[in-house]
Amino acid sequence: AAGAMRGYGIPQAMWAGESHLDDVAKALGRNPVEYRRQVVMPVGYRDEFSKNENYFDTFNQVMDKGMEAIGYQEKWEAYQHQTGPVRRGVGMALFWYNTAVWPISLESSSCRMVLNQDGSIQVQTGETEIGQGCDTAYAQMAADAVGIPFEDVHIVSTQDTDITPFGLGAYASRQTYIGGFSIRQTGQMLKERILTYAVELTRQTRANLDLIDGKIVRVSDG
């Protein structure tokens, strides 16, 4: 069964929905893949409940890649005229899973960054590493936002609520997306503070300074 860590019951519901879609396509005499292409959300579709908008043609892209990977079309054509008690089949199932739980509930995350004397940073966030690799993703995001090497980012992976910033939890495919935004915003604030101080030391304009790979550089000549 799909619990809170595996899709919130979506696989069960989609099994029924996609099976029904196959039955409808068969009743209409339609190719099941082409019928799906007709009814999936097109580019520009806006969901009135979540207010999310589909900006990319990813449904058709994943169908194309999946069909190519398993040789779908060749198998589908070969299996059309089988006889006997044992037969082979090939199918297509497609669904969209939302990230996080908005607008059902408010989403938020928090982050704290500390700059060490050696130029490395410590990052604390309320989101929990439970084996899905989010600490690695957070370190990459923090490094990119601040402008330092990945190796100089230390994630404090101890979600003790006495000392850790607030976070809503590890569920609903939310951590990288929601937690990542708080890390990005905090990293940009830290970077701005570093460069503002660098302006005082170098007498350069703020627009001519950037933080790249852990070094403060002049934008004009690198």
Q: Where in the sequence are the language-model features?
A:
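A short small-residue
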Residues: 1-2, 43-45, 163-174
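A glycine-rich phosphate-binding loop feature that marks nucleotide/adenosyl-phosphate handling sites
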Residues: 37-44, 79-95, 157-161, 198-221
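Short acidic, glycine/serine/threonine-rich loops at helix termini
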Residues: 47-50, 104, 133-136, 164-170, ...
